[in-house]
A protein has these predicted regions:
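Short, Gly/Pro- and small/polar-rich lid/capping loops
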Residues: 21-29
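Intrinsically disordered, low-complexity linker/terminal regions across diverse proteins
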Residues: 69, 256-259, 278-282, 338, ...
Length: 676
């Protein structure tokens, strides 16, 4: 089952990854002081780092994030190897961790097995006799981890009744994920589309098809996916919260979408009976109905087989992995695959996330860091409260609602209070890696359904594991969450001065808080319900101010001739804008209360160190292919823009570095967004 949240949480980065600092927090070697701050602050702050850290063959991007991610992978590997290096009692967590890692590392066995573990399931697809059986079999396979469906399904908080979960379905079924990869004539997109078609054909050949048959099936798959893409919404349209919510009764679903056998689908997926459902996007589901009725049975089976093989490829032999990597090279520009131990570590950490997380925090996360972080959060809440009070564009009524929502933030730091139970998850080394992953995904899917369908939302549940280098805000629970792994340099260091921590983790805290009041989060109240708590005039003022960010970021080139999508990145840009303003205000509060801290270090004032710290967080290099994909699919702006575009919107930055009207990054006051 492809898990579909009703409303996605807003994270700091799509994939996060940061660098060690000196005890002072700002490493002067990272800088290029020959650059002028007002012309290119990114180069000024971390030009030295970028020059000293060219991209290696393995990475599509590097940076302070990647350094921290690399360190974390080694830490997780050390934890895993304590169990994988020697036999463990059967059924224990140690056995599950060690056995799964060893299976993932055993390429000799997988190369010997080839595609054989997959063959019985491909036979099930090829033996399908009619369209009704097709829907049943693909639902059954999907429930065991083979993503054969043309739509997504899952469970999440009902955004109109956030205390309770709601079953949801929505658009899906695209191997490339994003509709524009099928429809755009952009040169890089055309190259990706061509590579994907070749990928499908090669995968099907490895699965046992001859060249001609594989070509026919790949062509059928591409045609069906293109049909789905044409009916699907783009990334910007998906950000419209209200336009992607269509709650109805189960009976209405059956009546309005009769071309899909919903009874057998939900039965095969393991869902108990339920009364209501959210159909996030209507047109793509109607198009799936048409596809199921109009395409030949052979072409439908070709689509299912292509997606089944693609889902299984990562658990089969090295030839499958090589084909996967070839597609990845075109999409991201990466030149060398990750070593097997990294892939195996990521697999174990993904499957047994909280088991690894518990080991991780016991070994690497001191309780003192959690307490210091909680104090920082309180300081940031105070700063945001002050800025709300001082806002001249909001009425007292809306301010009161905003303050109430802020006061009711749920704050999660480090790790969950209770850990997931993996007792009924089994790993059997007598079975292949693929067979084990089928069983594991079936367990995880059924566990997920049993905990959520017809149940209230568990607000204690975490959406990220402690070892994840990221953070998030969830509007339907009104929570901000900071996993243990992000509470390390350059984000957070208990041994550096306040300015550096406020520019790092303070900016992150403020970023996530701001998501509670961005273009999406502002539509939810303190209880997590989608509820308009704004006056009409205040909403108009808010939208006018956010449009400043849309227009500004839309004018910025991320690559020659290719600009950032200001509408797609609006929420994250509001997060950065608000995060910087809020954290800077919190720093000013600290300096006012502790005048002794208001001193220069290495010739930099606290205000300057604050902004240098923010830039250090986003240090990095990236391949053009990676940036190209990012600006098409990612709601986060590229790293350079999160410095050179974000900071010119912050008044305090101009004063800190004496930025003049003649400087290249200068933005006139009337074109700066003044929001949170």
């Amino acid at each position: 089952m492809k898990v579909k949240s009703i409303i996605l949480a807003c994270s700091l980065l799509a994939t996060m990854s940061a660098s060690a600092q000196t005890s002072k927090g700002i490493d002067l070697a990272n800088m290029n002081t020959a650059a002028k701050p007002g012309n290119d602050f990114y180069e000024y702050a971390i030009g030295g780092w970028r020059k000293a850290h060219p991209l290696d063959a393995e990475h599509a991007r590097n940076g302070s994030f990647t350094d921290l991610d690399e360190m974390n992978q080694k830490r997780i590997l050390a934890l895993i190897e304590e169990y994988s290096s020697k036999p463990q009692p059967k059924g224990t967590l140690g056995q599950k961790i060690g056995s799964l890692y060893n299976l993932a590392m055993d390429s000799v066995r997988r190369n010997r097995e080839g595609a054989e573990p997959l063959k019985p399931l491909l036979k099930k697809i090829n033996d399908i006799a009619d369209r009704r059986e097709y829907q049943l079999v693909t639902a059954q396979l999907d429930a065991r981890g083979l993503d054969c469906l043309m739509f997504g399904a899952g469970v999440g908080a009902d955004m109109k009744d956030a205390a309770n979960n709601l079953v949801g379905i929505g658009q899906g079924g695209l191997g490339l994920g994003e509709r524009d990869y099928y429809l755009s004539d952009d040169a890089q997109v055309v190259a990706v589309r061509k590579a994907y078609a070749e990928y499908l054909k090669k995968m099907l050949v490895l699965a046992g098809n001859d060249e001609a048959t594989a070509q026919r099936k790949a062509d059928a798959t591409m045609r069906i996916e293109t049909r789905i893409a044409k009916a699907s919404k783009g990334q910007v349209e998906l950000r419209d919260v209200q336009a992607n919510y269509h709650k109805m009764t189960y009976n209405a679903l059956v009546k309005d979408f009769p071309g899909i056998d919903w009874g057998n689908f939900f039965l095969a997926q393991g869902f108990p009976p339920f009364s209501h459902i959210d159909v996030g996007q209507l047109e793509p589901i109607h198009e799936v109905e048409k596809i199921l009725a109009e395409e030949s049975l052979d072409d439908l089976k070709a689509y299912a087989e292509s997606h089944a093989v693609s889902s299984a490829a990562g658990y089969l032999d090295d030839n499958f992995r090589a084909v996967e990597f070839e597609l990845g090279k075109v999409m991201s520009g990466v030149q060398q695959d990750r070593p097997r131990w990294k892939r195996a570590t990521a697999l174990v950490s993904g499957v047994l996330g909280e088991a690894i997380g518990k080991l991780y925090v016991e070994r690497y996360f001191p309780e003192s860091s959690k307490q210091q972080m909680l104090q920082l959060v309180r300081n940031l809440q105070k700063a945001l409260s002050q800025r709300i009070d001082e806002a001249t564009w909001m009425s007292p009524a809306t301010k009161a609602q905003a303050q109430d929502k802020l006061a009711n933030f749920i704050v999660k730091v480090g790790y969950p209070d209770t850990w997931k139970d993996y007792t009924n998850l089994h790993v059997d080394e007598q079975l292949s890696l693929f067979e084990n992953m089928q069983n594991i995904r079936a367990f995880l899917s059924q566990d997920y359904i049993s905990r959520k369908v017809n149940k209230p939302v568990d607000k204690a549940e975490w959406q990220m594991t402690p070892q994840t280098v990221n953070a998030y805000y969830n509007p339907t629970t009104n929570e901000i969450c900071f996993p243990a792994a992000i509470l390390q340099p350059p984000f957070f260091d208990p041994n550096v001065d306040e300015a550096v921590n406020y520019g790092g983790i303070g900016g992150v805290i403020g970023h996530e808080m701001s998501h509670g009041f961005d273009d999406q989060g502002s539509q939810f109240d303190k209880y997590g319900n989608q509820n308009d708590w704004w006056t009409a005039e205040d909403k108009k003022n808010f939208e006018a101010r956010t449009k400043v960010l849309v227009d500004y970021f839309s004018s910025i080139e991320a690559l020659p001739g290719k600009k950032i999508n200001g509408k797609l990145t609006l929420g994250e840009n509001i997060g950065d804008n608000g995060g910087l303003n809020i954290s800077f205000r919190a720093l000013q509060n600290v300096l006012k209360e502790n005048p002794a801290l208001n001193k220069s270090i290495d010739g930099f004032t606290p205000e300057q160190r604050f902004f240098l710290s923010w830039a250090t967080v986003w240090a990095g290099n990236a391949r053009p292919e990676f940036i190209d994909r990012q600006i098409k699919t990612d709601p986060h702006s590229p790293a350079e823009a999160r410095v050179n575009a974000a900071l010119p919107q912050i008044d305090a930055w101009y004063k800190a570095f004496n930025v003049k009207k003649s400087d290249k990054l200068f933005v006139p006051q009337k074109k700066r967004a003044q929001i949170w």
